[in-house]
Amino acid sequence: MTILIHGASGAQGAPVVATLLARGESPIAAVRDESSYSGTASAVSVDSSSVESLVTAYTGADAIFIHLPIGSGEQQLTQARAIVEAVQQVQPARVVVSTSGYPVDGPEGVEMPIGVLLEGLRASGVSLAVVTPKLFLENLLLPPVTSGVHDDAILRYPLRADYAVSWASHLDVAEVIATLLLDPTVTGTVGVGALPGLLGDDLAAGFSTHLDTPVVFEAQTPDAFGASIIPLFGEAGATPVVDSYRWRATQADEVIDADTSAQQRLGLTPRSVAQWLSDVSA
């Protein structure tokens, strides 16, 4: 079975490759430059903004994992449209998409890249599963976040203290994606994350358990968080991230639907915060 993994050297794609390899599969890593890929899978260079490049990569693939990398809204829209066109042309047997926590629907009249991607893929007629994580636990390992934990015993993050989220790790999401790539009978939405949703205090408690020292949660403004991550992602990369947290500030919570959760549909339960920290040796 030929399985192509977008962004195979990145935070989302690399764990999917590792999970598939552990299951005895031979995934193909779709990366920007195969000569710089240091992973253990076979690799192919792909320009996600080029329909021609995508069609070449997709041809012969039985299953494809797709997600949009961090970038400006314009860059992501270009990639979404190119991916849709390539899938429509090639018609692979199976496509699995991660929304990466991005909102599908935006303000009236505003095209959201992930919304454009999903609408086009659904119209293509291919077997499609959509994995919908909310927030990744790995965000809590960003240097601006971990410095607060280790220096001040404070977990600072741009969410209200009462904002419940179905947090999930990339490791848990990879397990779900790998399962779906190998099982085309499951289609539609599959939510990944903690049920019930976790509050900031729950996250801090996980760090407290792992570090064996008290850690408290402190809500941060999206703008303050954005200023701290610009050195990591650049302004173009940080802007949509900050916008997503401004959007979250207007919402009641971000909890997956139990009926369409991976727990219900696939029998897969995500790690606790403390277990995840132990697994990644943070």
Ranges and model annotations:
Residues 1-2, 282:
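Actinobacteria-biased recognition of intrinsically disordered, low-complexity terminal regions
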Residues 2-34, 49-52, 59, 68-78, ...:
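Oxidoreductase cofactor-interface core, primarily capturing Rossmann-like NAD(P)-dependent enzymes
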Residues 28, 82, 269-273:
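Contiguous, function-dense segments enriched for cysteine-driven chemistry
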Residues 38-50:
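Rossmann-fold cofactor-recognition segment
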Residues 41, 62, 93:
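Conserved acidic residues
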Residues 66-69, 260-261:
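Short glycine/proline- and acidic residue-enriched helix-loop micro-motifs
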Residues 223-282:
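A hydrophobic C-terminal alpha-helical subdomain
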